Amino acid sequence: MQISQDEYNKTHKITIKNNQSVGIDLGIKEFISLSNGLQIKAPKPLNKLNRFLVKRARQLSKKQHAKTKQEALQGIKKSNNYIKASMKLNKLHSKISNIRADFLHKLSSLIIRNFNYIGLESLNTQGMMKNHKLAKSLSDVSFYEFNRQIEYKAKYQEKEIYRVDKFYPSSKICSSCGNIKDNLTLKDRVYICNECGLKIDRDYNASLNLLSQLKQHIGLVQSEFTPADLTAMQYDLAINQIATSKVETGIQQKWYL
């Protein structure tokens, strides 16, 4: 489902210019992590519906239909049960697509409304799709579409998007001391710095590094994202039925062996 510019204009007013900035890390466990401590979750119905989708597809394959060109030439036709099952599968595909489109439209609009400068990583999506462990998750959350909507909405409202180089190791750099942890794996959900002892959520750490790169690029004095701003944003997300969580302040701490 595509959102036209006219539809966008009706529901989203031009935002007031400010110097507030944010680093955004796109993840698998959480859809995105923001440098203000908020983490956005993908819609829960998608997980359930995707499992149901697999079940429907298996049921469809068992119904009578021509499975090869040779069978088609032999006159094997689709049974009524196959046609009915196919219609149900298409309906489910549409439902999943609509939920995903609604989520991405609302989320990208809220980010553009709250921030004037946005730091994002330049993901090598094609390369990541080659990893079978990541491919399904990347397909479900539609990173490409999220990036596309952020780009065109930022351009329309004259906000600035800064793309950090795709080879910048945002997840491996300690946001406190700058040490690089080369042995960090996808299984490591908590970043523990071997140099200064910082213990912090992995994705939150990456978002802080992206924010740091953004600030170096724009070179402006930034206004602070206050607790009141954070509360207002959480409320805005809640009324739009977007699930969030806040990074535990206790997890961002230095510890020493």
Model-derived regions: residue spans:
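Substrate-contacting helices/loops that form the catalytic groove of nucleic-acid
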Residues: 1-147, 220-257
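Positively charged, low-complexity nucleic-acid-binding target-recognition regions
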Residues: 137, 141-257
